[in-house]
A protein has these predicted regions:
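Structural signature of tandem-repeat unit edges
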Residues: 50-56, 71-84, 93-106, 116-129, ...
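Consensus positions within tandem repeat domains that build extended binding/scaffold surfaces
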Residues: 86-89, 109-111, 131-134, 154-157, ...
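Surface-exposed repetitive/solenoidal architectures
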Residues: 25-94, 113, 203, 225, ...
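Bacterial N-terminal signal peptides
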Residues: 9-17
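Bacterial N-terminal signal peptides that target proteins for export
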Residues: 1-9
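Sec-dependent signal peptide cleavage junction
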Residues: 16-28
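Feature responds to low-complexity, polar/acidic, surface-exposed segments characteristic
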Residues: 669-685, 693, 698-745, 753-773, ...
Length: 870
């Protein structure tokens, strides 16, 4: 009951809002004529709110000042003899009714604009002109009758009359003002006079009109004439010659026939008519105009005339129900994005096609094959952009270039034949063609645009034709499966990030002709171990596989997989190029006193880097030189704290959380120098050196490492715990034999993360020697549970080892994975190579296995950690 009462009160309040409030009116009077001193017309306002005009001639305009009766008048009586209502004379007033004289001829601009309580009005015979916005925004007005005498109806005369449902327009006017009924949503139908010759701009825009008959004499339908109206059906007369921009856009039309008489088409005439299903263009029409049917998402049936010569840009763009269309043989020109976003499955361009604009067939979700007609020598950019199902393409035999982004994002395209005539492959031409494996560049190819083959991750190899002189920025960036790169003699420059993330390439030869190499050219090539430059190159050379300028000024590129964990930048180097050490596995880098500049992203992705030496004379470090994916713990800086502060001033800080040793030089001895029981020639030196330098292992006391000593289960877990940064572990282990403090946290952490289990329900046996199969289980568990790496797809055949059957069932998968990864290789004996799964591991063996494991997961982690290809 309470809810019902509230509803009634709400309705009453809304109704009352439409009625002017009753209040006492103070009588007043005055003159308001437009002639001489204004005395030709007088006005009188009585106590009841009745406003009476008497006199002869015109009432004055009130354009710049409000009339004195604006908020008092309720009923208006205009006396006989008055010929004109002045501009703004009743605008915004509270009047509810207006009585007009038979002598009236003109209603001026906004004379009754905004009379929101006025519900109806009758204009007497004799009225010739209804001025601009004369009754606009009269939101209670429901009907208007115009007399036969009306000759002119001004722009926006009835705009915003949201309750207007009935209008009678007499014969006589040749056109209706612009925006005449705009926003009149209750106006569902109207009878137009046969005298009309044109429908002006936005005359029925955003109007509720549903059905209408356009008079036969109309030749022009203006811009937005029916835009966003409720129109459901239209017959365009044969006499119409001009249709303006968006004339029927966003209406509710379901079908349309465009007559042959149309000679001038505007843009987007039927765009966004989401109910439009059928469109017929009559014979004689020569062009589908710009965006004519754009985003008509229900359009499925289109008939084009045999006289058609061109389909303009975006003509059918976004018509997602359009699956078939027959193109006339006469249609030879297609504008930008003409069919973009449609669901056409088969497009057959006529043999005489002479022009395909930008993106004509772009973003078509189901297009799988296409043949472009011979005769085309060039096509627009982005022609097939984003066509994710496109698999087969036949290009015209005379094509001279693959246009910019022509096949960008065509993720199903596996192979393509380029005509011998192709001399240039444009910017991003094949970018993101992730399935492309088979493409042969023509012998006559002269160049590539930026990122031409960007992220073609399935390309098996890269061979640059002999005629190419420059490689643009990012041209083969992200071709991660390419195992080789072949560059021609004659190549003079390699652009910025040209081969970035070609992660399967292990070596590269730089031709003698190369004069410049851009920053990050070889960044992200995580398997690259050697860069070679011919002795005849005047600009570059390599020292131990590291690329530098021949004058010794710049270190250009350090191969990410070059052996070793320390590197001393050669004396004399002044600059480290952008991305020079990108993704390396180095732990310590020493820079010479000659160094002055470190370029952008120089040490990005160096997740192993812990120690860095910088000279006092360094002048510039790029803000992002080493912040990303670096975990430098110690910087040895030859200068003072004040010098470092000035160096950092342009930015914020280079070494957040890093210990900076001022006025210092880095001295980190090798394992052989640290430990008296480690032979400098030992096979285990690389493993011991890495584990000690990376903080994974330490000595056993004094100057001893005990390389032949036993490795315990707790020690292996502790090493992995250190590798993970000693994360916090919570109580919850079932093991009762964890007596020593140094390993309690690490074992609890490993158990909680599913890396290890006990030797029984309550014991872990931390001091027991770790077996080879236990190491395998622990390492594979760590890779999966902590790092998220899955090596299960590649398992070795353990039956190849004489003792393969002796591997415990619980360890069999992990051992098979470890052998396949090269972490466990077996022990050589006179009787063959044995796994010895239950055998122990010495500390030097453990260091070697852990170093191999770290190198393996480090590569995978660097691949995972990269934000994106450059």
């Amino acid at each position: 009951m309470e809810k019902k009462l509230l509803s009634i009160l709400l309705v009453l309040s809304l109704m009352l809002a439409l009625v002017p409030a009753a209040f006492a009116v103070e009588p007043a009077s005055g003159t308001c004529g437009a002639e001489g001193d204004g005395s030709n017309v007088t006005w009188t306002l009585d106590a009841s709110g009745t406003l009476t005009f008497t006199g002869t001639g015109a009432i004055r305009d009130y354009a710049s000042s409000a009339p004195p009766w604006r908020y008092s008048a309720v009923t208006v009586v205009v006396g006989e003899g008055i010929t004109r209502l002045g501009a703004y004379m009743l605008a915004g007033s509270t009047v509810t009714s207006v009585s007009l004289p038979s002598t009236l001829t003109d209603v001026d601009t906004q004379a009754l604009n905004g009379c929101r309580y006025l519900t109806g009005i009758t204009f007497p015979d004799g009225v010739k002109t209804i001025g601009e916005q004369a009754l606009s925004n009269c939101t209670s007005l429901t009907s208007v009758t115009l007399p036969a005498s009306v000759e002119t109806i001004g722009d926006r005369a009835f705009m915003g009359c949201t309750m207007l449902a009935s209008v009678t327009i007499p014969e006589g006017p040749t056109h209706l003002g612009t925006n005449l009924f705009r926003g009149d949503w209750e106006l569902k139908s109207i009878l137009l006079p046969q005298s009309l010759t044109q429908l002006d701009e936005s005359v029925f825009s955003s109007c509720g009109i549903e059905t209408i008959t356009i008079p036969d004499n109309v030749t022009v339908i203006g811009n937005k004439a029916f835009f966003a109206s409720g129109l459901t059906d239209i017959s365009i007369p044969a006499g119409v010659t001009d249709i303006g921009d968006r004339a029927f856009s966003q209406t509710r039309l379901t079908s349309v026939t465009v007559p042959a008489t149309i000679r001038s088409f505007g843009k987007y005439i039927f765009s966004e008519c989401v109910d439009l299903h059928t469109a017929v263009l009559a014979e004689g029409i020569t062009r589908v105009s710009d965006g004519m049917f754009r985003d008509c998402t229900n359009l499925a049936d289109v008939t084009l005339p045999q006289t058609l010569t061109a389909i303009a840009q975006q003509a059918f763009s976004g018509c997602t129900d359009l699956e078939h269309i027959a193109l006339p043989e006469t249609t030879v020109k297609y504008g930008a994005c003409a069919f973009s976003g449609t669901y056409l499955t088969d497009v057959r361009f006529p043999a005489g096609t002479s022009y395909l604009g930008k993106g004509v067939l772009s973003n078509m979700p189901v297009l799988q094959q296409i043949t472009l007609p011979d005769g085309l020598t060039s096509v627009g950019a982005e022609l097939f952009l984003g066509d994710k199902e496109l698999k087969e393409v036949t290009l015209p035999s005379g094509l001279t270039a693959v246009s910019d982004s022509m096949f960008s994002g065509c993720t199903a395209l596996q192979s393509i034949d380029l005509p011998d005539t192709v001399a240039y492959i444009g910017e991003s031409a094949f970018s993101g063609c992730t399935a492309l494996t088979d493409i042969t560049f023509p012998a006559g190819l002269e160049g590539f645009g930026k990122k031409a083959m960007y992220y073609c991750i399935s390309l098996p190899e890269i061979t640059v034709p002999a005629g190419v002189r420059t490689l643009a920025e990012g041209v083969f960036n992200g071709c991660s499966k390419a195992s080789s790169i072949t560059l021609p003699n004659g190549l003079t420059s390699i652009g910025y990030s040209a081969f970035a993330y070609c992660g399967n390439v292990q070596e590269i030869d730089i031709p003698d002709s190369v004069e410049s190499i851009g920053g990050l050219a070889f960044s992200g090539m995580y398997l690259l171990s050697d860069i070679r430059v011919g002795a005849g190159n005047p600009t570059y050379h390599t020292v131990d596989g590291v690329l530098m300028t021949k004058d010794g000024y710049e270190l250009t590129a350090y191969p990410a997989s070059r052996p070793g964990i320390r590197y001393d930048v050669p004396d004399g180097i002044v600059e480290i190029a952008p991305g020079a050490f990108y993704g390396s596995g180095l732990v310590a880098v020493r820079c010479p006193d000659s160094l002055r500049k470190i370029g952008e992203r120089a040490f990005e992705g160096n997740i192993n880097l812990r120690y860095l030496q910088l000279p006092a004379g360094i002048q510039s470090i790029a803000q992002d030189a080493m912040l990303s994916q670096c975990d430098i713990t110690d910087v040895y800086y030859g200068g003072t704290e004040e010098q470092m502060r000035k160096l950092e001033e342009p930015y914020s800080i280079f070494f957040n959380g890093t210990t900076i040793h001022y006025n210092s030089y880095m001295v980190i001895p090798s394992a052989a120098e640290l430990f008296t029981d480690v032979d400098a020639d030992s096979w285990a030196i690389p493993g011991i050196d890495f584990c000690v330098l990376a903080g994974l292992m330490s000595g056993v006391g004094g100057n001893a490492f005990a390389p032949k000593g036993v490795t315990t289960r707790a020690q292996v877990v502790q090493i992995l715990y250190n590798l993970s940064g000693c994360p916090k572990a919570y109580d919850g282990s079932p093991f009762t034999d964890l007596t020593a403090d140094w390993y309690q946290h690490s074992i609890v952490w490993a158990y909680q993360n599913g890396i290890v289990s006990g030797t029984s329900a309550t014991t872990f046996e931390p001091e027991a020697p770790v077996t080879r199969e236990q190491i395998a289980v622990i390492l594979m568990g760590y890779a999966e549970k902590v790092l998220g790496l899955d090596f299960s797809a590649d398992k070795a055949d353990l039956t190849a080892f004489p003792d393969g059957a002796s591997v415990s069932d619980w360890a069999r998968d992990a051992v098979a994975e470890a052998v396949a990864l090269g972490l466990i290789s077996g022990a050589q004996t006179k009787d063959g190579t044995f796994l010895q799964p239950q055998g122990g591991a010495t500390r030097e063996q453990a260091a070697t296995i852990l170093t191999s494991f770290y190198s393996l997961v480090d590569l995978d982690l660097r691949l995972m950690l990269k934000d994106s290809v450059l």
